[in-house]
Amino acid sequence: MDERIKVLAKTLVNYSMKVQKGEKVCVHYTGEATQGLARQIIKEVYKVGGIPFPKYTDTRVLRETLLNCTKEQMELKGKIDATLMEEMDCYVGVRGSDNVSELSDVPSEKMAIYEKYYSTPVHHDVRVKKTRWVVLRYPNNAMAQLADSSLEAFEDFYFDVCNLDYAKMLKAMTHLVEYMDNTDEVRIVGPGTDLTFSIKGIPAVPCAGESNIPDGEVYTAPVKNSVNGTIKYNTPAVYQGFTYENISLTFKGGQIVDASSNNTKRINEVFDTDEGARYIGEFAIGVNPHITKPMKDTLFDEKIMGSFHFTPGSCYDEADNGNISAIHWDLVCIQTPEYGGGEMYFDDVL
């Protein structure tokens, strides 16, 4: 067993989830490559007196299920798994599918059924709100290919990024959290972007290894109806198996009134999932100094130093702006010079 896997498993169990004796832990792993880490997590859970409950997902089997799924089927599946999740104290999701596009040909109406009747009741309503949870990707050939890297070099990068001193990172975020907490209006400008919104009265929350690995962001949410202007995202975004590029959104009174991308019809179908899908649920700033370029993986891309993400869909309880949706889609814009630059003003201060 790679010693770095052992270090990561200990971090997940002892720092991220803080598993205590007698607590029940859902160990949810996706893809064959994740089995080694899943086994090590189970060992660490037992070491601290916890009780692991492993759950495996194969995305090819999931695709086959979703192609002809019904509302009634997903409602029952969601009810069963939500009941199980209610029993858990902690949750770790290790995701390592060997094909990020596996669900790309599932019809949008079927994905909407899955999001609304399964993902929302199981994950948003129970897992996020009632467990100490952490999610992460696991390095495999698919991820290395997306990062234009050999597998060995990508594994080295991955473990360097994931096995950071997150307690030290948390302390370093203090100033940014305080600054955001004291800000009313935010203005963001850049190539194709001129956007204004308020974050007044909504807490800024630091993220340092407790819910995501890798981590490194400070998030809040805009006042729901305060968003106006246009944003042009410069980072590809994989959602439901499809890679979106050149995404541009225009807002009026908080609502997305125009959306375009390399597949404008498909992206508008996502935003038509429900009313809340056309409003923003999160605004966050990425601060991980080890992540500097996109790799079509949200958990990494949203942490890029010099980036921000502006997220259509549901908000988090910790930074509640009242928006509710079956989707939560982190879309990333990088403002470093290599990606066109840009400026961010807090109450007119750069």
Regions found by a protein language model. Give the residues of each.
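Active-site bordering "gate/hinge" segments
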Residues: 1-229
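Short acidic-glycine loop/turn motifs at beta-strand connectors
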Residues: 191-192, 199-201, 251-253, 346-349
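Dual-mode signal for accessory low-complexity, basic/Gly-rich regions
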Residues: 258-323
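Active-site lining segments that contact anionic ligands and/or coordinate catalytic metals
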Residues: 228, 244-246, 253, 278-282, ...
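Short, glycine-/Ser/Thr-/acidic-enriched flexible segments
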Residues: 32-33, 97-99, 140, 202, ...
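Intrinsically disordered terminal and processing segments
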Residues: 309, 313-350
